UniProtKB/Swiss-Prot annotation:
A ubiquinone binds at H201. Keywords: Electron transport, Heme, Iron, Membrane, Metal-binding, Mitochondrion, Mitochondrion inner membrane, Respiratory chain, Transmembrane, Transmembrane helix, Transport, Ubiquinone. CDD domains: cytochrome_b_C, Cytochrome_b_N. It is found in: Mitochondrion inner membrane. This is Cytochrome b. Its cofactor is heme b.
Amino acid sequence: MTNIRKTHPLLKIINDSLVDLPVPSSVSSWWNFGSLLAACLAVQILTGLFLAMHYTSDTATAFNSVTHICRDVNYGWILRYLHANGASMFFICLYIHVGRGLYYGSYMYSETWNIGIILLFAVMATAFMGYVLPWGQMSFWGATVITNLLSAIPYIGTDLVQWIWGGFSVDKATLTRFFAFHFLLPFIIAALVVVHLLFLHETGSSNPTGIPSDPDMVPFHPYHTIKDILGILTMLTVLSMLVLFSPDLLGDPDNYIPANPLNTPPHIKPEWYFLFAYAILRSIPNKLGGVLALVLSILILAIIPMLHTSKQRTMMFRPLSQCLFWLLAADLLTLTWIGGQPVEHPYIIIGQAASVLYFTIILLLMPLVSTMENHLLKW
Protein backbone atom coordinates (compact mmCIF):
# COMPACT_ATOMS: atom_id res chain seq x y z
CA MET A 1 0.00 0.00 0.00
CA THR A 2 1.33 3.45 -0.97
CA ASN A 3 2.04 5.83 1.89
CA ILE A 4 -0.62 8.54 2.33
CA ARG A 5 2.01 11.29 2.31
CA LYS A 6 2.81 10.33 -1.29
CA THR A 7 -0.80 10.22 -2.53
CA HIS A 8 -2.78 12.83 -0.57
CA PRO A 9 -2.95 16.06 -2.68
CA LEU A 10 -1.89 18.36 0.18
CA LEU A 11 0.51 16.03 1.99
CA LYS A 12 2.17 15.22 -1.35
CA ILE A 13 3.28 18.87 -1.72
CA ILE A 14 4.72 18.90 1.82
CA ASN A 15 6.33 15.49 1.22
CA ASP A 16 8.01 16.64 -2.00
CA SER A 17 9.28 19.81 -0.29
CA LEU A 18 10.32 18.61 3.17
CA VAL A 19 10.53 14.81 3.29
CA ASP A 20 11.52 13.09 0.04
CA LEU A 21 13.22 16.13 -1.50
CA PRO A 22 16.61 15.06 -2.94
CA VAL A 23 19.42 17.23 -1.52
CA PRO A 24 23.11 17.16 -2.53
CA SER A 25 24.99 15.15 0.09
CA SER A 26 27.77 17.76 0.29
CA VAL A 27 25.70 20.76 1.45
CA SER A 28 27.18 22.27 4.59
CA SER A 29 25.76 24.18 7.54
CA TRP A 30 25.83 27.37 5.44
CA TRP A 31 22.68 25.97 3.80
CA ASN A 32 20.89 26.00 7.20
CA PHE A 33 20.08 29.69 7.10
CA GLY A 34 17.01 29.31 4.87
CA SER A 35 15.26 27.26 7.55
CA LEU A 36 16.54 29.65 10.26
CA LEU A 37 14.95 32.54 8.36
CA ALA A 38 11.66 30.62 8.20
CA ALA A 39 11.88 30.10 11.98
CA CYS A 40 12.63 33.82 12.49
CA LEU A 41 9.62 34.77 10.35
CA ALA A 42 7.38 32.44 12.37
CA VAL A 43 8.65 33.94 15.67
CA GLN A 44 8.14 37.49 14.35
CA ILE A 45 4.60 36.84 13.08
CA LEU A 46 3.54 35.10 16.32
CA THR A 47 5.04 37.66 18.72
CA GLY A 48 3.88 40.52 16.49
CA LEU A 49 0.33 39.20 16.45
CA PHE A 50 0.16 39.19 20.27
CA LEU A 51 1.80 42.61 20.50
CA ALA A 52 -0.74 44.03 18.02
CA MET A 53 -3.55 42.93 20.36
CA HIS A 54 -2.33 45.46 22.95
CA TYR A 55 -0.67 48.16 20.83
CA THR A 56 -2.47 51.37 19.82
CA SER A 57 -1.30 53.24 16.72
CA ASP A 58 -2.03 56.74 17.95
CA THR A 59 0.64 59.37 18.61
CA ALA A 60 -0.91 60.16 22.01
CA THR A 61 -0.95 56.57 23.27
CA ALA A 62 1.58 54.54 21.20
CA PHE A 63 4.54 55.03 23.58
CA ASN A 64 2.35 54.36 26.64
CA SER A 65 0.82 51.25 25.05
CA VAL A 66 4.32 49.76 24.61
CA THR A 67 5.07 50.60 28.26
CA HIS A 68 1.73 48.99 29.22
CA ILE A 69 2.68 45.82 27.27
CA CYS A 70 5.98 45.58 29.16
CA ARG A 71 4.55 46.33 32.63
CA ASP A 72 0.96 45.10 32.77
CA VAL A 73 0.45 42.39 30.12
CA ASN A 74 1.30 38.83 31.19
CA TYR A 75 4.72 38.07 29.69
CA GLY A 76 4.35 41.22 27.57
CA TRP A 77 7.99 42.17 28.23
CA ILE A 78 9.23 38.88 26.76
CA LEU A 79 6.96 39.27 23.71
CA ARG A 80 8.25 42.79 23.12
CA TYR A 81 11.93 41.85 23.47
CA LEU A 82 11.56 38.63 21.46
CA HIS A 83 10.05 40.71 18.67
CA ALA A 84 12.71 43.45 18.82
CA ASN A 85 15.69 41.10 19.12
CA GLY A 86 14.06 38.58 16.76
CA ALA A 87 14.43 41.25 14.06
CA SER A 88 18.18 41.40 14.79
CA MET A 89 18.46 37.60 14.51
CA PHE A 90 16.42 37.79 11.29
CA PHE A 91 18.93 40.20 9.73
CA ILE A 92 21.97 38.26 10.96
CA CYS A 93 20.57 35.12 9.27
CA LEU A 94 19.53 37.16 6.21
CA TYR A 95 22.99 38.65 5.64
CA ILE A 96 24.71 35.28 6.15
CA HIS A 97 22.19 33.69 3.73
CA VAL A 98 22.97 36.33 1.06
CA GLY A 99 26.71 35.98 1.77
CA ARG A 100 26.49 32.22 1.28
CA GLY A 101 24.68 32.84 -2.03
CA LEU A 102 27.53 35.12 -3.16
CA TYR A 103 30.28 32.75 -2.01
CA TYR A 104 28.84 29.58 -3.52
CA GLY A 105 27.37 31.08 -6.71
CA SER A 106 23.71 30.49 -5.78
CA TYR A 107 22.90 33.65 -7.79
CA MET A 108 23.17 31.55 -10.96
CA TYR A 109 19.59 30.44 -10.23
CA SER A 110 18.34 33.86 -11.34
CA GLU A 111 14.62 33.48 -10.49
CA THR A 112 15.33 32.30 -6.93
CA TRP A 113 17.97 35.04 -6.53
CA ASN A 114 15.70 37.83 -7.79
CA ILE A 115 12.80 36.77 -5.55
CA GLY A 116 15.36 36.75 -2.72
CA ILE A 117 16.29 40.38 -3.48
CA ILE A 118 12.60 41.37 -3.43
CA LEU A 119 12.31 39.54 -0.08
CA LEU A 120 15.32 41.45 1.26
CA PHE A 121 13.72 44.79 0.32
CA ALA A 122 10.38 43.70 1.83
CA VAL A 123 12.01 42.65 5.12
CA MET A 124 13.97 45.91 5.28
CA ALA A 125 10.79 47.95 4.69
CA THR A 126 8.94 45.96 7.36
CA ALA A 127 11.75 46.41 9.90
CA PHE A 128 11.96 50.15 9.21
CA MET A 129 8.21 50.63 9.74
CA GLY A 130 8.30 48.48 12.87
CA TYR A 131 11.05 50.68 14.33
CA VAL A 132 8.72 53.69 14.07
CA LEU A 133 5.87 52.09 16.05
CA PRO A 134 7.12 52.46 19.67
CA TRP A 135 7.08 56.24 19.01
CA GLY A 136 10.28 57.00 20.90
CA GLN A 137 12.71 59.76 19.93
CA MET A 138 14.72 57.61 17.51
CA SER A 139 11.50 56.14 16.06
CA PHE A 140 10.17 59.60 15.22
CA TRP A 141 13.40 61.14 13.95
CA GLY A 142 14.44 57.99 12.09
CA ALA A 143 11.08 58.02 10.29
CA THR A 144 11.44 61.76 9.53
CA VAL A 145 14.98 61.48 8.15
CA ILE A 146 14.54 58.29 6.10
CA THR A 147 11.17 59.24 4.53
CA ASN A 148 12.57 62.72 3.82
CA LEU A 149 15.17 61.11 1.54
CA LEU A 150 12.42 60.66 -1.06
CA SER A 151 12.28 64.45 -1.42
CA ALA A 152 15.56 64.11 -3.36
CA ILE A 153 13.58 62.65 -6.30
CA PRO A 154 13.24 65.44 -8.90
CA TYR A 155 9.81 67.05 -9.53
CA ILE A 156 7.67 64.64 -7.48
CA GLY A 157 9.88 64.24 -4.37
CA THR A 158 8.19 66.75 -2.04
CA ASP A 159 4.68 65.65 -3.01
CA LEU A 160 5.68 62.00 -2.57
CA VAL A 161 7.01 62.63 0.96
CA GLN A 162 3.83 64.47 2.00
CA TRP A 163 1.73 61.70 0.47
CA ILE A 164 3.60 59.07 2.52
CA TRP A 165 3.38 61.19 5.68
CA GLY A 166 -0.33 61.90 5.16
CA GLY A 167 0.35 65.53 6.07
CA PHE A 168 3.16 68.05 6.36
CA SER A 169 5.14 66.12 8.98
CA VAL A 170 5.43 62.66 10.54
CA ASP A 171 2.28 62.49 12.65
CA LYS A 172 -0.76 60.38 13.57
CA ALA A 173 -1.60 59.50 9.94
CA THR A 174 1.99 58.31 9.35
CA LEU A 175 2.01 56.14 12.47
CA THR A 176 -1.38 54.56 11.64
CA ARG A 177 -0.42 53.65 8.07
CA PHE A 178 3.00 52.36 9.14
CA PHE A 179 1.29 50.06 11.64
CA ALA A 180 -1.12 48.83 8.94
CA PHE A 181 1.74 48.09 6.52
CA HIS A 182 3.93 46.60 9.24
CA PHE A 183 1.11 44.17 10.07
CA LEU A 184 0.42 43.30 6.42
CA LEU A 185 3.93 42.93 4.98
CA PRO A 186 5.05 39.80 6.93
CA PHE A 187 2.19 37.84 5.33
CA ILE A 188 3.26 39.09 1.88
CA ILE A 189 6.82 38.03 2.83
CA ALA A 190 5.50 34.55 3.77
CA ALA A 191 3.83 34.29 0.34
CA LEU A 192 7.06 35.39 -1.38
CA VAL A 193 8.96 32.75 0.61
CA VAL A 194 6.69 30.08 -0.91
CA VAL A 195 7.48 31.47 -4.41
CA HIS A 196 11.20 31.56 -3.48
CA LEU A 197 11.04 27.85 -2.53
CA LEU A 198 8.97 27.03 -5.61
CA PHE A 199 11.71 28.37 -7.90
CA LEU A 200 14.43 26.72 -5.78
CA HIS A 201 12.76 23.31 -6.10
CA GLU A 202 12.51 23.77 -9.88
CA THR A 203 16.31 23.76 -10.16
CA GLY A 204 17.29 21.93 -6.99
CA SER A 205 19.76 23.22 -4.43
CA SER A 206 23.34 24.14 -5.30
CA ASN A 207 26.26 22.68 -3.33
CA PRO A 208 29.67 23.82 -2.07
CA THR A 209 31.60 22.30 -4.99
CA GLY A 210 29.47 23.94 -7.69
CA ILE A 211 29.46 20.79 -9.84
CA PRO A 212 26.22 18.90 -10.71
CA SER A 213 25.24 16.68 -7.79
CA ASP A 214 22.56 14.51 -9.45
CA PRO A 215 24.42 11.20 -8.86
CA ASP A 216 24.96 11.94 -5.15
CA MET A 217 21.74 12.95 -3.41
CA VAL A 218 20.25 12.18 0.01
CA PRO A 219 16.62 12.60 1.14
CA PHE A 220 15.83 15.80 3.06
CA HIS A 221 14.36 13.77 5.94
CA PRO A 222 15.95 12.66 8.26
CA TYR A 223 19.38 14.07 7.35
CA HIS A 224 18.57 17.73 6.85
CA THR A 225 15.55 17.92 9.14
CA ILE A 226 17.82 16.95 12.06
CA LYS A 227 20.46 19.42 10.87
CA ASP A 228 17.87 22.22 10.58
CA ILE A 229 16.35 21.46 14.00
CA LEU A 230 19.82 21.70 15.56
CA GLY A 231 20.35 25.06 13.81
CA ILE A 232 16.96 26.38 14.92
CA LEU A 233 17.57 25.29 18.54
CA THR A 234 20.99 27.00 18.49
CA MET A 235 19.47 30.21 17.11
CA LEU A 236 16.61 30.17 19.64
CA THR A 237 19.16 29.64 22.45
CA VAL A 238 21.16 32.70 21.31
CA LEU A 239 17.93 34.71 20.95
CA SER A 240 16.74 33.63 24.43
CA MET A 241 20.07 34.63 26.00
CA LEU A 242 19.89 38.00 24.26
CA VAL A 243 16.28 38.59 25.39
CA LEU A 244 16.76 37.40 28.97
CA PHE A 245 20.21 38.81 29.79
CA SER A 246 20.68 41.96 27.67
CA PRO A 247 17.46 42.83 25.81
CA ASP A 248 18.54 46.43 25.09
CA LEU A 249 22.03 45.56 23.83
CA LEU A 250 21.16 46.20 20.17
CA GLY A 251 18.59 48.96 20.74
CA ASP A 252 18.96 52.72 21.13
CA PRO A 253 18.56 54.34 24.58
CA ASP A 254 16.91 57.39 22.93
CA ASN A 255 13.90 55.22 22.14
CA TYR A 256 13.00 55.21 25.86
CA ILE A 257 12.31 58.94 25.52
CA PRO A 258 8.82 59.70 24.09
CA ALA A 259 8.87 61.25 20.59
CA ASN A 260 9.31 65.02 20.68
CA PRO A 261 9.15 66.89 17.34
CA LEU A 262 10.71 69.97 19.00
CA ASN A 263 13.86 68.23 20.23
CA THR A 264 16.26 66.59 17.77
CA PRO A 265 18.59 63.86 19.14
CA PRO A 266 22.32 64.66 18.67
CA HIS A 267 22.92 61.57 16.51
CA ILE A 268 20.04 60.21 14.45
CA LYS A 269 20.74 56.65 13.35
CA PRO A 270 18.68 53.60 12.32
CA GLU A 271 18.89 50.12 13.84
CA TRP A 272 22.31 48.41 13.59
CA TYR A 273 21.29 46.25 10.61
CA PHE A 274 20.80 49.33 8.39
CA LEU A 275 23.97 51.14 9.46
CA PHE A 276 26.08 49.90 6.50
CA ALA A 277 23.59 51.39 4.02
CA TYR A 278 23.24 54.53 6.17
CA ALA A 279 27.04 54.98 6.10
CA ILE A 280 27.01 54.74 2.29
CA LEU A 281 24.17 57.30 2.18
CA ARG A 282 26.09 59.74 4.42
CA SER A 283 29.39 59.32 2.57
CA ILE A 284 28.08 61.26 -0.46
CA PRO A 285 27.64 65.03 0.14
CA ASN A 286 24.90 65.32 -2.51
CA LYS A 287 21.38 64.32 -1.33
CA LEU A 288 20.20 62.64 -4.57
CA GLY A 289 23.59 60.97 -5.04
CA GLY A 290 23.41 59.60 -1.50
CA VAL A 291 19.91 58.20 -2.02
CA LEU A 292 20.98 56.55 -5.30
CA ALA A 293 24.04 55.02 -3.60
CA LEU A 294 21.82 53.78 -0.76
CA VAL A 295 19.41 52.01 -3.15
CA LEU A 296 22.23 50.69 -5.36
CA SER A 297 24.08 49.25 -2.35
CA ILE A 298 21.30 46.63 -2.16
CA LEU A 299 20.11 46.62 -5.79
CA ILE A 300 23.66 45.83 -6.91
CA LEU A 301 22.88 42.22 -5.93
CA ALA A 302 20.59 42.00 -8.99
CA ILE A 303 23.48 42.48 -11.45
CA ILE A 304 25.87 40.05 -9.74
CA PRO A 305 24.87 37.14 -12.08
CA MET A 306 25.94 39.35 -15.03
CA LEU A 307 29.30 40.07 -13.37
CA HIS A 308 30.12 36.35 -12.97
CA THR A 309 33.12 35.80 -15.27
CA SER A 310 34.61 32.70 -13.64
CA LYS A 311 34.53 29.25 -15.23
CA GLN A 312 33.79 27.83 -11.78
CA ARG A 313 30.51 28.44 -10.05
CA THR A 314 31.61 28.64 -6.42
CA MET A 315 34.60 30.24 -4.69
CA MET A 316 35.53 26.95 -3.03
CA PHE A 317 38.56 26.43 -5.32
CA ARG A 318 39.29 30.13 -5.99
CA PRO A 319 41.55 31.51 -3.22
CA LEU A 320 41.94 34.99 -4.77
CA SER A 321 38.16 35.45 -5.00
CA GLN A 322 37.88 34.17 -1.42
CA CYS A 323 40.24 36.94 -0.27
CA LEU A 324 38.06 39.53 -2.03
CA PHE A 325 34.89 38.06 -0.53
CA TRP A 326 36.24 38.31 3.02
CA LEU A 327 37.56 41.81 2.26
CA LEU A 328 33.99 42.71 1.26
CA ALA A 329 32.68 41.21 4.54
CA ALA A 330 35.23 43.24 6.54
CA ASP A 331 34.29 46.35 4.53
CA LEU A 332 30.60 45.87 5.41
CA LEU A 333 31.50 45.55 9.10
CA THR A 334 33.54 48.78 8.81
CA LEU A 335 30.56 50.54 7.18
CA THR A 336 28.29 49.26 9.98
CA TRP A 337 30.67 50.72 12.56
CA ILE A 338 30.96 54.06 10.70
CA GLY A 339 27.16 54.33 10.33
CA GLY A 340 26.85 54.47 14.12
CA GLN A 341 29.50 57.19 14.54
CA PRO A 342 28.95 60.98 14.45
CA VAL A 343 29.65 62.87 11.20
CA GLU A 344 33.13 64.19 12.02
CA HIS A 345 36.79 63.59 11.19
CA PRO A 346 38.13 60.85 10.79
CA TYR A 347 34.83 58.95 10.43
CA ILE A 348 33.78 60.87 7.29
CA ILE A 349 36.85 59.90 5.26
CA ILE A 350 36.80 56.28 6.54
CA GLY A 351 33.12 56.02 5.50
CA GLN A 352 33.86 57.43 2.04
CA ALA A 353 36.81 55.06 1.53
CA ALA A 354 34.76 52.05 2.70
CA SER A 355 31.85 53.03 0.41
CA VAL A 356 34.14 53.34 -2.64
CA LEU A 357 35.77 50.01 -1.75
CA TYR A 358 32.34 48.31 -1.46
CA PHE A 359 31.33 49.21 -5.02
CA THR A 360 34.87 48.68 -6.40
CA ILE A 361 35.11 45.12 -5.05
CA ILE A 362 31.73 44.07 -6.48
CA LEU A 363 31.79 45.92 -9.82
CA LEU A 364 35.47 45.82 -10.72
CA LEU A 365 37.75 43.61 -8.64
CA MET A 366 35.63 40.43 -8.42
CA PRO A 367 35.05 40.12 -12.22
CA LEU A 368 38.74 40.97 -12.92
CA VAL A 369 40.08 38.46 -10.39
CA SER A 370 37.68 35.78 -11.71
CA THR A 371 39.01 36.34 -15.26
CA MET A 372 42.57 36.15 -13.94
CA GLU A 373 41.79 32.86 -12.18
CA ASN A 374 40.45 31.49 -15.49
CA HIS A 375 43.85 32.18 -17.07
CA LEU A 376 45.65 30.63 -14.10
CA LEU A 377 43.69 27.40 -14.75
CA LYS A 378 45.56 27.04 -18.07
CA TRP A 379 48.97 26.86 -16.39
